[in-house]
A protein has these predicted regions:
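N-terminal charged segments
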Residues: 1-98, 116, 121-135
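Active-site beta-strand termini and strand-to-loop segments that position acidic
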Residues: 51, 108, 144-146
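Conserved catalytic-core motifs of GNAT/GCN5-like acyltransferases
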Residues: 99-108, 218-229
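A conserved beta-strand-loop-helix scaffold within acyl/acetyltransferase catalytic domains
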Residues: 133-139, 144-162, 167-170
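Conserved GNAT acetyl-CoA-binding A-motif
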Residues: 161, 190-202
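Conserved glycine-rich acetyl-CoA-binding loop
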Residues: 162, 167-181, 203-204
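Conserved acetyl-CoA-binding loop-helix of GNAT-fold acetyltransferases
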Residues: 175-191, 210-214
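Conserved beta-strand-loop-alpha-helix junction that forms the acyl-donor binding cleft
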Residues: 199-210, 218, 225-227
Length: 229
């Protein structure tokens, strides 16, 4: 258990795992390239991450010109994460229009206890399809009330090493702890299979942040993704 826990809280390891989940990999220490087209994901011009151990790391699209990369790296030296205005100023100087996304990612401190009130459904199950929540992976972890699915969690993306949660609860069944239970069931299934379950959200998503707190998750990194507009 100690060995597993130590691996769980290695922030740079988990940052690279999530990058690969999004179809990217690190090359030459500070550059990234797309290795797989993932729906809904755009190749970042630059990615800056504040790690749980206090370090800040940055990666650049390998297609970025050398002079722009050097200017961004020089600006990064005096940056106080998550304030990135100096980087955006550099991009404006180079006439690069950009958009920014800011996200927080967590891992689970231990394998959740099995919850007999949560069932595992096929994404093809008619109750799951009626809920509008089939997702990209086969297994959906859900709770039923009166014969219908009211809360569910599935991997929004998953590979042989990790997965990332996508959770939704019907509005009339919220604030009853259902989301917490289905996320825990989903996470437990991945961890028992030797995979890392990630929970991520945009920093402005207060409801998702509160759910992370109720789940007792460990913040592992916070990232700012800059893409071309």
């Amino acid at each position: 258990m100690k060995r597993w826990y130590h691996k769980m809280v290695d922030p740079i390891h988990h940052l690279h795992l999530q990058m690969r989940l999004e179809g990217r990999e690190v090359v030459d220490a500070c550059f990234i390239r797309e290795v797989e087209a993932v729906p809904g994901e755009e190749m970042p011009l630059m990615l800056i991450a504040g790690l749980a151990n206090g370090n800040v790391v940055a990666y650049y699209d390998e297609a970025v010109s050398g002079d722009l990369q050097e200017a961004l790296a020089a600006s990064l030296a005096g940056l106080e994460f998550p304030a990135i205005d100096p980087l955006l100023d550099v991009l404006k100087t180079y006439d690069v229009q950009s958009e920014v996304g800011h996200y927080k990612t967590y891992v689970f401190p231990s394998i959740p206890v099995k919850d007999r009130g949560v069932d595992c459904f096929s994404k093809l199950d008619k109750r799951v399809r009626a809920f509008g929540f089939d997702g990209p992976t086969e297994q959906v972890y859900a709770m039923e009330r009166e014969g219908k699915v009211v809360s569910a969690c599935v991997s929004t993306r998953e590979n042989e090493k990790c997965g990332e949660a996508w959770v939704f609860t019907a509005p009339e069944y919220r604030h009853q702890g259902f989301a917490q239970r289905v996320v825990n069931a989903w996470a437990g299934s991945l961890m028992n299979a030797g995979k890392v379950p990630f929970y991520s959200h945009k920093v402005e998503n207060v409801a998702s942040a509160h759910l992370a707190g109720r789940l007792g998750l460990l913040p592992v990194f916070e990232e700012i993704v800059i893409i071309r507009a």
